[in-house]
Amino acid sequence: MAILGLGTDIVEIARIEAVIERSGERLARRVLTDAEWAHYQQHQQPVRFLAKRFAVKEAAAKAFGTGIRNGLAFNQFEVFNDELGKPCLRFFAKAAELAEQMGVRHVHVTLADERRYACATVIVES
């Protein structure tokens, strides 16, 4: 295994909250997959949930070396938890194609939040 990419991102939770106050659920609908949307709607702290998902997806796009552009979209990355609660990442559409082209076989995700911030790091390996 070799590291193909590393990305990290930090999000100010109040900034996400301000966007939601201004534009309603548009940001959440743009960032989240359908499965994540279902969790978001039921979550006790939806703004914090969205901020963490946003951070993971930004970090993943950075690990790919592209950022969110050229057909790559937030909702092409899906964050889920394994049976032990560990965060994991799934790819769809352009993100899945790019992962295949890069030879991604393993993905490591870590995320954290503390009062004002959410942060995430993603490592993609061959």
From Swiss-Prot:
Catalytic activity: apo-[ACP] + CoA = holo-[ACP] + adenosine 3',5'-bisphosphate + H(+)
Cofactor annotation: Mg(2+)
Any Gene Ontology CC annotation: cytoplasm
Chief place of localization: cytoplasm
GO terms classed as biological process: fatty acid biosynthetic process
GO MF terms held by the record: holo-[acyl-carrier-protein] synthase activity; magnesium ion binding
Subcellular location: Cytoplasm
Keyword line: Cytoplasm, Fatty acid biosynthesis, Fatty acid metabolism, Lipid biosynthesis, Lipid metabolism, Magnesium, Metal-binding, Transferase
Keyword Hydrolase: no
InterPro entries, per the entry: 4-PPantetheinyl_Trfase_dom, 4-PPantetheinyl_Trfase_dom_sf, ACPS, Ppantetheine-prot_Trfase_dom
Pfam families linked: ACPS (PF01648)
Binding site for Mg(2+): D9, E58
Listed EC numbers: 2.7.8.7
Function according to Swiss-Prot or TrEMBL: Transfers the 4'-phosphopantetheine moiety from coenzyme A to a Ser of acyl-carrier-protein.
Protein family membership: Belongs to the P-Pant transferase superfamily. AcpS family.
Name of the protein in question: Holo-[acyl-carrier-protein] synthase
Taxonomic source organism: Pectobacterium carotovorum subsp. carotovorum (strain PC1)
Gene for this chain: acpS
